[in-house]
A protein has these predicted regions:
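A cross-kingdom feature that marks ATP-driven nucleic-acid transaction machinery
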Residues: 102-250
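Phosphate-coordinating catalytic segments in nucleotide- and nucleic-acid-processing enzymes
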Residues: 81-82, 97-98, 114-117
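Short acidic, hydrophobic short linear motifs in intrinsically disordered regions
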Residues: 79-91
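Short, mixed-charge aromatic SLiMs
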Residues: 47-53, 94-99, 197-202
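Short, solvent-exposed loop/helix junctions and linker helices
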Residues: 65, 94-97, 165, 169
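Conserved Helicase C-terminal RecA-like lobe
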Residues: 91-96, 143
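Interdomain motor-coupling "hinge/lid" segment immediately C-terminal to the ATP-binding subdomain
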Residues: 1-80
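Residue-level marker of alpha-helix boundaries and capping positions
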Residues: 6-7, 93-94, 166, 216
């Protein structure tokens, strides 16, 4: 019921921002549902993050542990970039894929991060057009991502004028979690070789590829999505934002 969504829009946005901060880790959600205390939320999240990093030392080979920490700690910084493609050289200067591939795979196998591969050609089947050298990394939970940045609850819940670019990263993290919660959906992303005109997510429908453009607020300008639709003519496209629901043609 889109009219109902519009009527309760302000309340829904408040709850969404609350979820951004709290996230979905069971221990955090349980405590927040009982105490409604953002300080307790942050303390539990920090404990979870420390626990995960202690697990690196317990379960991974000793020589791999420093690289696990470097990859893990680099994810918020990598997502803060306008171009969110994972860059090895920004983890450690001069690094290449071979330096961190095992660490990334270890974190993937443990379910602590999600990997979104670039698609070279938005055609069916998407798996046939994966660019294995280009990808984005996201954390398992949006609340943990915010905790790793030390952003205060007030910035997330009430908003802040200087909190702009990273807001886009949080929105992508949230949309990713919603996509992968649907069994069988594998999100990818698309960009041209020069990285201009990126489509935040691509998913494979039964008979077509569905592009998804992610907007953090109500700005509906979507040059990349428009150009993509004009070139590839998908059956339909999706643009998420804080704006009211609408259907439109280009």
């Amino acid at each position: 019921d889109t009219q109902m969504v519009t009527v309760f829009k302000t309340k829904y946005i408040e709850r969404l921002r609350e979820y951004y901060f709290v996230g979905g880790m069971p221990e955090v959600v349980k405590d927040f549902s009982e105490k409604k205390d953002y300080n307790r939320v942050r303390a539990i999240q920090k404990n979870l993050i420390n626990y995960y990093q202690q697990d690196f030392s317990k379960h991974a080979e000793i020589k791999l542990v420093p690289r696990l920490n470097l990859v893990w700690n680099s994810i918020p910084m990598q997502l803060a970039k306008e171009n969110k493609k994972y860059i090895y050289g920004q983890v450690r200067e001069g690094s290449r894929a071979k330096d961190f591939e095992l660490a990334i795979q270890w974190l993937l196998d443990c379910g602590l991060i999600h990997k979104v591969q670039r698609i070279q050609k938005p055609d069916l089947p998407l798996k046939a057009y994966i660019d294995f050298d280009a990808f984005k990394l996201f954390l398992v939970d949006i609340g943990l991502l915010i905790a790793m940045t030390d952003l205060d609850a007030k910035v997330i819940i009430e908003g802040n004028k200087i909190f702009t670019e990273f807001k886009g990263a949080l929105t992508e993290q949230y949309i990713l979690q919603q996509l992968i919660s649907d069994v069988g959906v594998i999100p990818y992303y698309y960009s041209t070789q020069n990285s201009k005109g990126e489509i935040d997510f691509l998913v494979q429908g039964k008979t077509s590829v569905i592009p998804i453009e992610v907007k953090a607020e109500e700005n509906l300008k979507a040059k990349s999505l428009k150009a993509f639709c004009e070139k590839y003519q998908p059956s339909y496209a999706v643009r998420t934002s804080m704006s009211d629901y609408r259907e439109q043609d280009w």
